[in-house]
Amino acid sequence: MENQKQYPMTQEGFEKLEHELEELKTVKRPEVVEKIKIARSFGDLSENSEYDAAKDEQGFIEQDIQRVENMLRNALIIEDTGNNNEVQLGKTVTIVELPGEEEEEYQIVGSAESDAFKGKISNESPMAKSLIGKKLDDEVRVPLPNGGEINVKIVNIK
């Protein structure tokens, strides 16, 4: 049997995926079935754009259901170790770009629940890879997409 990719995530991320799956199965799937039913009533399916669009949408929804089910089945829940001295998956880290004083806060999560707009960065991102394993007051070099790098200081871990 082939090894399945594991998806590290917080308990909150796991519950969010469970909610997404429930929504897909109980709301989205029935909605698209109804759209298909209505489109079929228009007659000739060979030139029925509403039917084609609804079938395409159904395919996307079924793919989403499979994707979320796979992620839940292979989820690796991140337990809080209570160690706030080292940056780890699931921890929230506050950094300051050097030289400077402006603080930025990020929670390091699995790729399945990353959301940069909410300050949740993937453990696979260059920033997280640079920070994981580092300690409070460490200065860290973080690679940038353009090939450059920035220096940051870890000022808080929680």
Curated annotation (Swiss-Prot):
GO molecular function terms noted in the UniProt entry: DNA binding; RNA polymerase binding
Pfam entry (one): GreA_GreB_N
Superkingdom of origin: Bacteria
GO annotation, biological process: DNA-templated transcription elongation; regulation of DNA-templated transcription elongation
Keywords: Coiled coil, DNA-binding, Transcription, Transcription regulation
Residue ranges the record marks as coiled coil: 4-75
HAMAP family: GreA_GreB (MF_00105)
Physiological role: Necessary for efficient RNA polymerase transcription elongation past template-encoded arresting sites. The arresting sites in DNA have the property of trapping a certain fraction of elongating RNA polymerases that pass through, resulting in locked ternary complexes. Cleavage of the nascent transcript by cleavage factors such as GreA or GreB allows the resumption of elongation from the new 3'terminus. GreA releases sequences of 2 to 3 nucleotides.
Protein name: Transcription elongation factor GreA
Organism expressing this protein natively: Staphylococcus saprophyticus subsp. saprophyticus (strain ATCC 15305 / DSM 20229 / NCIMB 8711 / NCTC 7292 / S-41)
Gene: greA
